[in-house]
Amino acid sequence: MIRFFVNRPDLRYVGKIHEHLVRKGRSGLHLTDATKQLAFLHTGYQEQEKKDKSKFERNLNIILEILKQDPENCDYLGYLGDTYSSDGKNEEARDAYKKAVAAMPEKLGVYDQRSSYTYTNLLRVSQCLNEPEAEVEAIYKEAVEKLPKEPDFDCVMGEWYWRKGQYEKAVQMYELAIAKLETYGTVNRGIITTSMLIQMYECLGEGCRKLGDYQKAVRYCVIVLNTDHKDVDALLTLINCFAESNVSAEEVVQFLGKIYDYSDIKDKVILLRVAMAMGRKDLERMFRGILLPQEREEFDAAMETAQSGAPLS
C-alpha cells in the first residue's frame, strides 16, 4: 500500500486491523474537502480475497480479542458486523450492528464514517432478513437523527422501497439522497449514493413515470441520457413518457435531436434499434429516414446477419 502522508511523529495509523489515520495531540486531524485537488479511485477487492477463509478467521479472532478487552467499542462491534456480513451470516451481523449502535455516544461527529457504515449495513442486513417494515424504518429514523447529512441511509431505503414496488417512497428517498449529496459533499459520506447515481436517476425517471409525473420523469431521463446516450432504460422510459402524454412521433424526434447527434451514425442506430424493439413503427420509419442511403444499407445488412445467427464482422 502506498501512503500519501508526510512522515511526522504525530501522524500515525492505529488499529490492529481496519487501521485508520490519527494525529496525536489536542488539535487532532483537520478534515477538508480536497477532492478537486486530489482523488483516489478504489477499484475494490478481488473476489478471491473476499473468499479467503483464513483471512476471515484471522480478522474475526482479532476483533473478538479486542472486544473481550473493550466490549463497548462501537467501532469494533461494527467491524464484527462487517466480518459476519461478508461471510453471509446476516443474523450475527445484525446482532453485532445493533450492539454497536447501542454503544455509540449520544452525539456523533459530522464525519464519523464508521458509524455511518454501521447504520447503513444494519439497514441492509435488516432488509435482507425481511425484518418488519416498521422496524427498518425505525432504524432509518434513528440513523438520520444521528447523522443527518449522510445520503446513504436515504439511498439504501430508496433501493429497498423500489424492490418492494413502493415507488412513491422510493422516489422520495432517492431525491433526498441526491439533495444531501449535492448539499453536503462526499467527504467521509455518500459512498453508496455516489456509486449508484445513474441507477438512482434511472429509477427516478421510471418511478415518476409510474406515478404520472411526466415532467419530472423527462427531466431525470434527460440527465441520464446527457451522460450516456446508450442508456436504453432511460431512453425507453423517456419515449414511454411521451407516448403516455400523447406526444406525436415528430415531436419525439425533434426533442431527441437535442440530446442525440443526428449526424452521428452511432446515435441514429441506437434510436432506430430502440424504436424497433418497442414496436413503434412511426418512430422506426422516422429514424430510418434520417439514415443516409449507405448507412441504411449497412444497417439492414447487419440486422439480416444478426437474425441469421452468423457472427457480425
Q: Where in the sequence are the language-model features?
A:
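Alpha-helical repeat scaffolds
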Residues: 94-102, 132-144, 169-176, 214-223, ...
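Flexible helix-coil transition and linker loops at the boundaries of alpha-helical arrays
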Residues: 66-69, 102-115, 129, 143, ...
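Catalytic-site signature of metal-activated, phosphate-bearing donor transferases
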Residues: 1-88, 92
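TPR alpha-solenoid repeat register
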Residues: 76, 110-111, 118, 153, ...
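Structural motif corresponding to the intra-repeat A-B loop/turn of tetratricopeptide repeats
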Residues: 87, 129-130, 164, 211, ...
